[in-house]
Amino acid sequence: MPELVGEWIGKYHGHFEEVIRINLQDGKWIATKITGDENVPAGEITWRVDPTTCIGEGQIAGQGFLKPSFVPGHLEILSPSRIIFHWEELGQVEYRRDD
């Protein structure tokens, strides 16, 4: 299992770059927003993934964090410093390590 714990920078479609922190909790990689946006604010989970399968779910919400929900997704590990989270039918975000 690659070591993904730490801070990452991602470019969200239509938004500025955002910083997330990945932690390993209860056997899952949990990505929490350090900087947020009008849909999913700082402090909220943006995605969570089973490290053994890279299958998980990403959080979506309307503006103002209305009707938040999780949709299927998966994580693609390109290298130790680049990953992509794919929201099923909603696009993707590429992240790079913030070191």
In which residue ranges do the predicted regions lie?
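Soluble ligand-binding/transfer domains with enclosed cavities or grooves
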Residues: 1-99
